[in-house]
């Protein structure tokens, strides 16, 4: 069998394009490799946000959405848009799983607990959805409505939760029942790297009201956290309970509705509510009726309000049907993105698909190791290219995104420089074997490290376009106005393969 000349797609997570060089870690880092590629290779900019990826207009892109669109080869209607629409249409209020959980609790005079990332960020959740859930519980007769707020500060400015908390305090005052019952930073409640000690802090807060601090209002609890030097993301377990109020710890028979729609950071805390769990010793394990807003994992046996819509003939599935071999490779932080999300929410590997996982470094925050595990990832990537085994290789480098999220500018520059060296080695390997390479990103981040409006650090994604660069021996000229969902049809075209009818994206090569 002759050695294959692979077509590789390298996704530089969080690597957007911004003309303004102020606080732009990508523009200011020393990047001889990327500079040379942009000067000498076919390249263009493509859209990775808003309506172009199935998000609301102007909404910044994110990794889940980006990889889903890239892999699908069509614009995929995102959960955020789907759920917002269902609320406006009145469908949300009739959703079977939600109705059943709330009505069962009401009938037994039990509490309805609503938990989720309390933020207008729109990446993992949206506070408008949480508001609709609170109103629905109240309308269906729930008297005890407890809201457990996971605070953001990552997809939103680092200290921006007060407006959201005030909004819910006002809502409960208007309803005359229910309250904000707890606060904790997403660092604890939404870990995705098996740091079970962090998750346990959130679990104990929910199930035992075990907290480091207690305050009589959510806004007061937040102010105290800021006094202690904690930004939203890192707020310690805080119980919100005024004199004479009963504990809001979850009890047998209560309903629990988890209002995050994005799976990767919702899985771990959700698994703590399943009988078969070994992450840590649970001091309390209330028998609650738990509803996931969307399916967080196929093996979690809990009710789902919005089951996944299946995608037929994604890039990975289509390659498999053509008898092609493919490799998916990344670090822990983005492994789910190049596998599960890229495959349209399918956990299992397709025939001919292999996966390689490189462990992300075990550091508290990635500014402490901005190169992350790029050296090892690149070694494996180069070996895969030269192995002659794969028709296609999909690789994600997380650095620009994960270090961009820390808000530490110097570290972001170092991350970009580490990436540049890695890309150089990948380019050399591709040229050596006569393969083809597309370099792109799933959304922006590190190109804006300071918020131009406030002058504060900017830790969130951006709505800016991302690069698309071609390396290979074909005479390629790109069309303008492309988007992420055009990548799969473009890759199939470059590989000389037929494009399935389901892929409505355009081929970006003229």
From Swiss-Prot:
InterPro entries given in the database record: Alkaline_phosphatase_core_sf, BPG-indep_PGM_N, Metalloenzyme, PGAM_B_sf, Pgm_bpd_ind
Top EC category: isomerase
UniProt entry keywords in alphabetical sequence: Glycolysis, Isomerase, Manganese, Metal-binding
Co-factor requirement: Mn(2+)
Identification of the protein by name: 2,3-bisphosphoglycerate-independent phosphoglycerate mutase
Function (record text): Catalyzes the interconversion of 2-phosphoglycerate and 3-phosphoglycerate.
Sites where the protein binds Mn(2+) 1: 401, 405, 461
Single biological process term from Gene Ontology: glycolytic process
Keyword check for Metal-binding: yes
Active site: 63 (phosphoserine intermediate)
Molecular function as annotated in GO: manganese ion binding; phosphoglycerate mutase activity
Record field: catalytic activity: (2R)-2-phosphoglycerate = (2R)-3-phosphoglycerate
Cofactor binding annotation: Binds 2 manganese ions per subunit.
Organism expressing this protein natively: Vibrio vulnificus (strain YJ016)
Subunit composition and interactions: Monomer.
Any one annotated GO CC term: cytosol
Residues bound to substrate: 124, 154-155, 186, 192, 262-265, 334
Family that this chain belongs to: Belongs to the BPG-independent phosphoglycerate mutase family.
Alphabetized Pfam families for the sequence: iPGM_N, Metalloenzyme
NCBIfam families, A to Z: pgm_bpd_ind, PRK05434.1-5
Pathway membership: Carbohydrate degradation; glycolysis; pyruvate from D-glyceraldehyde 3-phosphate: step 3/5
E.C. code: 5.4.2.12
Residues binding Mn(2+) 2: 13, 63, 442-443
């Amino acid at each position: 069998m002759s050695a294959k000349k692979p077509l590789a797609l390298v996704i530089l997570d969080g690597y957007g394009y911004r003309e303004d060089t102020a606080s732009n870690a990508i523009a200011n880092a020393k990047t001889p490799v990327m500079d040379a590629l942009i000067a000498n290779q076919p390249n263009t900019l493509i859209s990775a946000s808003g309506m172009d990826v199935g998000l609301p207009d102007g909404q910044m892109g994110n990794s889940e959405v980006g990889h889903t669109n890239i892999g699908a080869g069509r614009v995929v209607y995102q959960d955020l848009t789907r759920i917002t629409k269902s609320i406006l249409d009145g469908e949300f209020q009739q959703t079977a799983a939600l109705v059943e959980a709330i009505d069962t609790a009401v009938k037994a005079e039990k509490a309805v607990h609503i938990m989720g990332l309390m933020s207008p960020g729109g990446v993992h959740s949206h506070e408008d959805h949480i508001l609709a859930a609170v109103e629905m519980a109240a309308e269906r007769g729930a008297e005890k409505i407890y809201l457990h707020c996971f605070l953001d500060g990552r997809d939103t400015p680092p200290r921006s939760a007060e407006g959201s908390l005030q909004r819910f305090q006002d809502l409960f005052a208007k309803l005359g029942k229910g309250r904000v019952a707890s606060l904790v930073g997403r660092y604890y409640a939404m870990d995705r790297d098996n740091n079970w000690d962090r998750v346990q802090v959130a679990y104990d807060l929910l199930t035992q009201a075990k907290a480091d601090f207690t305050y009589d209002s959510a806004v007061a609890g937040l102010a105290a956290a800021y006094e202690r030097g904690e930004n939203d993301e890192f707020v310690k377990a805080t119980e919100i309970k005024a004199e004479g109020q009963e504990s809001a710890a979850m009890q047998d028979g209560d309903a629990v509705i988890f209002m995050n729609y994005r799976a990767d950071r919702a899985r771990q805390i959700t698994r703590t509510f399943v009988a078969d769990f070994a992450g840590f010793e649970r001091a309390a394990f209330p028998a609650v009726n738990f509803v996931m807003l969307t399916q967080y994992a196929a093996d979690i046996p809990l009710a789902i309000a919005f089951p996944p819509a299946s995608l037929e003939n994604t890039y990975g599935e289509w390659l498999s049907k053509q008898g092609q071999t493919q490799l998916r490779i990344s670090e822990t932080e983005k492994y789910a993105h190049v596998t599960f999300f890229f495959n349209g929410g399918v956990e299992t590997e397709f025939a001919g698909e292999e996966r390689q996982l490189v462990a992300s470094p075990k550091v508290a925050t990635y500014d402490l190791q901005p190169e992350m595990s790029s050296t090892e990832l690149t070694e494996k990537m180069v070996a895969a290219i030269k192995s002659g085994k794969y028709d296609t290789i999909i690789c994600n480098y997380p650095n620009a995104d994960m270090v961009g999220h820390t808000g530490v500018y110097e570290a972001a520059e170092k991350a970009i420089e580490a990436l540049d060296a890695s890309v150089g080695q990948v380019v050399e390997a591709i040229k050596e074997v006569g393969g083809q390479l597309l370099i792109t990103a799933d959304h922006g981040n590190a190109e804006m490290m300071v918020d131009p409006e406030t002058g504060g650090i900017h830790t969130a994604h951006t709505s800016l376009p991302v690069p698309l660069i071609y390396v290979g021996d074909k005479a390629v000229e790109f069309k303008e106005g492309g988007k992420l969902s055009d990548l799969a049809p473009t890759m199939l075209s470059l590989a000389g393969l037929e494009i399935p009818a389901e892929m409505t994206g355009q081929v970006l090569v003229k």
